[in-house]
Amino acid sequence: MNTEMYQTPMEVAVYQLHNFSISFFSSLLGGDVVSVKLDNSASGASVVALDNKIEQAMDLVKNHLMYAVREEVEVLKEQIRELLEKNSQLERENTLLKTLASPEQLEKFQSRLSPEEPAPEAPETPETPEAPGGSAV
C-alpha cells in the first residue's frame, strides 16, 4: 500500500476503506470486473462517486432488511393474536366443562392427573367411553 502520499490518518483510512470496498464488490461481481486504483491521480469526483455508490448499496441492504423485519413482526403479531384467542376460547371451554361435570367425573379426572402429573397419556388410553358427559368438541 502506498500511503506516503496521504498526510493524515483519516486520508489513509479512507484509502484503505476504498481499496477494501473495491475488492469486496469485485468479489461479489465475480472477479476483476472493477479495476480501480485509488491514488493521488484519482480525481476527487470519482472518490465521491464511489462513496455515494457504496452508501446507496448499504442503504438498499438496510431498507430491504428493515422491510423484511417489519413483515416478520406483523406475521408474528397476527400469530400471537390468534393464539391468545384460541387460549381464551379453550379457557372458557374448560370452565364450562368443569361446571357441567359431575363430582364423580371430576374425581376420576383428578385421579388420572395425580399419579402421572401432566397427563399427556390420558387422551391416548381408549378407556374414555365410560364418561357419560359426551364430547367436549
Swiss-Prot record:
Single Gene Ontology BP annotation: negative regulation of activation-induced cell death of T cells
A Pfam family of this chain: TSC22
Protein's UniProt keywords contain rRNA-binding: no
Location of the region described as Disordered in the Swiss-Prot/TrEMBL record: 101-137
Expression induction: Induced by dexamethasone in lymphoid cells. Induced by Il4, Il10 and Il13 expression in monocyte/macrophage cells. Transiently induced by Il2 deprivation in T-cells.
An annotated Gene Ontology molecular function: MRF binding
Gene Ontology, cellular component aspect: cytoplasm; nucleus
Tissues/organs with expression: Expressed in T-cells. Expression inversely correlates with T-cell activation, being higher in resting cells and lower in cells activated by TCR/CD3 triggering (at protein level). Constitutively expressed in lung, intestine, kidney and liver, most probably by resident cells from the macrophage lineage. Expressed in thymus, lymph nodes, bone marrow, spleen, lung and skeletal muscle.
Ranges where the record places region AP1-binding: 1-60
Keywords associated with the record: Cytoplasm, Nucleus, Phosphoprotein
Residues covered by region (Leucine-zipper): 76-97
Residue numbers carrying Phosphothreonine: T125, T128
Keyword Nucleus annotated: yes
Entry-linked InterPro entries: TSC22/Bun, TSC22/BUN_CS
Modified residue annotations for Phosphoserine: S102
Comp. bias regions, Low complexity: 128-137
PROSITE patterns linked to this entry: TSC22
Function of the molecule: Protects T-cells from IL2 deprivation-induced apoptosis through the inhibition of FOXO3A transcriptional activity that leads to the down-regulation of the pro-apoptotic factor BCL2L11. In macrophages, plays a role in the anti-inflammatory and immunosuppressive effects of glucocorticoids and IL10. In T-cells, inhibits anti-CD3-induced NFKB1 nuclear translocation and thereby NFKB1 DNA-binding activities. In vitro, suppresses AP-1 transcription factor complex DNA-binding activities.
Subunit and interaction comment: Can form homodimers, however it is likely to function as a monomer. Interacts with NFKB1. Interacts (via N-terminus) with JUN and FOS; these interactions inhibit the binding of active AP1 to its target DNA.
Family as reported in the entry's similarity comment: Belongs to the TSC-22/Dip/Bun family.
Domain notes: The leucine-zipper is involved in homodimerization.
Protein name per the record: TSC22 domain family protein 3
Phylogenetic classification of the source organism: Eukaryota, Metazoa, Chordata, Craniata, Vertebrata
